[in-house]
From Swiss-Prot:
Tagged with keyword Ribosomal protein: no
GO cellular component: cytoplasm
Organism listed in the record: Geobacter sulfurreducens (strain ATCC 51573 / DSM 12127 / PCA)
Location in or out of the cell: Cytoplasm
Record's catalysed reaction(s): 1-(5-phospho-beta-D-ribosyl)-ATP + H2O = 1-(5-phospho-beta-D-ribosyl)-5'-AMP + diphosphate + H(+)
Gene that produces this protein: hisE
UniProt-recorded name of the protein: Phosphoribosyl-ATP pyrophosphatase
Entry keyword annotation includes ATP-binding: yes
Amino acid sequence: MNERDDILQAVYEVILDRKGALPESSYTASLFHKGIDKILKKVGEEATEVIIAGKGGKREEIVYETADLLFHTLVLLGHYDIAPADVYNELRRRFGTSGHAEKASRNE
């Protein structure tokens, strides 16, 4: 792992620690308590905010909103006990493969 992986893993571990906590103890615990529909709603909201920030073209806003999207995506992964390493491995599998070839392989 490198420094980028480490911060995502560190955040993920905190998220998992809060998974079984009382909802009033943290924002993350409250998301888990509200269930998958609330988590998915937040991921969708944050994705929309990234799109809006991207359209606006302001670097700071894009970075800020992308951080929110990554956080909420990690909560989604945590809900299903999917480690960030699983996503990294999928990206590594795709790396160096043409996007067209990768997409075609999914249709086989």
